Amino acid sequence: MGENGMGDNPFGGLPFFGDMMKAMAGQGPLNWDIAQQFAVMGTSTEGGQPNVDPAARIALEQLIPIAVMHVGDVLGDAAQLSLSQAKYEFFTPAQWCHSTLNAYKPLFNELATALGQPSASTAGAHTDIDLENSDPMSQMMRNLASMMAPSLLGMTIGSMIGQLALKAFGQYDLLLPRSPENTVLLVPDTIDDFAESWSSPHADMRMWVLIHELAAHAVLQVPHI
């Protein structure tokens, strides 16, 4: 603890703020509660349907075997067999958002941990600085920034996923593999809304999305990828 009596807590002399800072300090590298809240806020702005439109889901289901055949013609029999055995799930934007946050949670945790570690150049720059004897206000701001970083990162990631959920056609708008590996996610209502906005035939748009998603799924299932 420094001479000012605050230690690592800039609000050590104020009980209410001190308790709040302790809670923030124990939230880990990324605050997932805030990330989920901001993601849900992003998907709720459009006032979408609580469930997938059955007609849109059935229309996609009928095209899946044809899309599997076309992808198999290019990528081979092994890819066609894998896609024919895959499980296909149909989500609303809000459901896609929740699934994506859970699927990429380990990745975002690793990112947050890496961002929270000082680089070699930054660490070297502070080698000769005695933090205990530095300016109290500067020390307080450094501690406050480190405590707020998980919440701010949670806001950023939650807002990003929430906005992406409003436009995503499937799980490979972000070209990253995700678990479970044998599942393909599709967002029928968003696909149809896009086709309607651009005056495109719905069947053509659905087939394009299916081929894009199935091709990405088949490639990312290759072990060396």
Residue ranges of each PLM-predicted region?
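Extreme N-terminal leader/anchor segments
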Residues: 16, 22, 26, 30-33, ...
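Hydrophobic, well-ordered secondary-structure segments
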Residues: 158, 207-211, 216
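Short pre-active-site segment immediately N-terminal to the catalytic Zn-binding motif
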Residues: 191-209
